[in-house]
Amino acid sequence: MMNMRKTHPLMKIINNSFIDLPTPSNISSWWNFGSLLGLCLITQIITGLFLAMHYTSDTLTAFSSITHICRDVNYGWLIRYTHANGASMFFMCLFLHIGRGLYYGSYLFYETWNIGIILLIITMATAFMGYVLPWGQMSFWGATVITNLLSAIPYIGTDLVQWIWGSFSVDKATLTRFFAFHFIFPFIIVAMVMIHLLFLHEAGSNNPTGITSESDKISFHPYYTLKDMLGMMFMFLILMSLVLFYPDLLGDPDNYTPANPLSTPPHIKPEWYFLFAYAILRSIPNKLGGVLALFMSILILFLLPYLHTSKHRSMVFRPVSQCIFWLLVSDLLILTWIGSQPVENPFITIGQLASIYYFLSILILIPLAGLIENYMFKW
C-alpha cells in the first residue's frame, strides 16, 4: 500500500507543495522570507480575529474599545501589540523578499512576480486601513490626507473621494467600511498567496546562481523545513522583543490622542513602511504629479521583467549591477528617512534627488548596466 500522503487527494497537494517538492540544493537564507511571510500572515489573521471580537467600528467608541482591549481583556495588550508590530515584521520580510527577487532575477518568472506585486498592493491597502481603525489623531489625519489624494484625478476625483468616505468628510461611514475591508482583505491575500505558490511550483524555484538547477535538487522536507523553522524562531525572537520591550518603538505618539477634526497634528506621516512612497509623493510640488509618482513607485515593479537586458539572470556575477542595486537600497533608506522629516530644506531637496535616483536606477541604470556587462563578458 502506498503512503497516504501520496495518494489522498488533499494530502497529495500538501505533499507536493511542502514535503516532496524538488528544491534547488543551493538556495540561501534569502529564500526563507516566503515562509516567514506566510507565518506573519497567519499571525496577523489570528491576532486580528481576536481583536475584532472586542473592537467597535464607531467613531464615538473606537478609541475607547482599543483602550478596553489593552486594559481589561486578558492579554489584550499582547494581542494588540503583536498585531501592530506584526505588521512591521510583515513589511520588513516583504521588502527583503522583493529585494531578493530583484537581486537574483526572480522577476523573470512573470506570473509569480506579477501576482507578488498585486499581493504587495493589497497588503499595503490592508495595512493603511488597519492604521485608521484605532481612531487616534494620526489615524484620522492619515486617512484624510491619503484618501484626499484621489481628488487630484481629473473629472471624477471629488466624487470618488466622497464615495470612499461615504460622507463629506472622514466619518463613521468611513471607519465602518475600512473595518469591513480590513477584515476581508487578509482572506483575499490568502487566496492570492495560493495562486502565487501555484505559479511558483509550476516554474520551480530560482537559485542564487540564476542557472538551471534541474540536475541538482533535493526534497523540501526535512532540509528546508528545518531551515525555515530556524528563520521563524529568529523572526519570533525579534517580534517578541519588540512587543514585550519596545511596543511603541515603531508607532506614533500622536495616535494615543483621540481623533479630533479641529486639531491638526504638527507633522502628518504614515507608518514607517510607507515613508519611502510618502517621500516620493511629497517631492513633487504638483498634486496630480505627486499622486502619479506615488502609484508609479510601486507599479514600476511590473516593468522589471521587460527591463532585463543582461544575459545573466542573477546579479551574483555582475559587479556593476550589484553597485547600482546597493545604491538603490541606500536610496530607499534615505527616502524612508526623508518621509519622516518635516517639509523644509534641506529635506525637500534631498527627497527630490532621492526620488529622481529611484526612478533613474530602475528605468535606466540597471538595464544599462546589463548591456555594459554583456559587452564586458563579450556576449
From Swiss-Prot:
CDD domains: cytochrome_b_C, Cytochrome_b_N. It is a multi-pass membrane protein. Heme b b562 binds at H83, H182. Keywords: Electron transport, Heme, Iron, Membrane, Metal-binding, Mitochondrion, Mitochondrion inner membrane, Respiratory chain, Transmembrane, Transmembrane helix, Transport, Ubiquinone. It holds the Pfam family Cytochrome_B. GO terms for molecular function: metal ion binding; ubiquinol-cytochrome-c reductase activity. One of its GO terms (cellular component) is mitochondrial inner membrane. Its main location: mitochondrion. SUPFAM superfamilies: a domain/subunit of cytochrome bc1 complex (Ubiquinol-cytochrome c reductase), Transmembrane di-heme cytochromes. Binds 2 heme b groups non-covalently. Signal peptide: none annotated. Heme b b566 binds at H97, H196. It is found in: Mitochondrion inner membrane. A ubiquinone binds at H201. Its cofactor is heme b. Heme 1 (or BL or b562) is low-potential and absorbs at about 562 nm, and heme 2 (or BH or b566) is high-potential and absorbs at about 566 nm. Belongs to the cytochrome b family. Component of the ubiquinol-cytochrome c reductase complex (complex III or cytochrome b-c1 complex) that is part of the mitochondrial respiratory chain. The b-c1 complex mediates electron transfer from ubiquinol to cytochrome c. Contributes to the generation of a proton gradient across the mitochondrial membrane that is then used for ATP synthesis. The cytochrome bc1 complex contains 11 subunits: 3 respiratory subunits (MT-CYB, CYC1 and UQCRFS1), 2 core proteins (UQCRC1 and UQCRC2) and 6 low-molecular weight proteins (UQCRH/QCR6, UQCRB/QCR7, UQCRQ/QCR8, UQCR10/QCR9, UQCR11/QCR10 and a cleavage product of UQCRFS1). This cytochrome bc1 complex then forms a dimer. This is Cytochrome b.
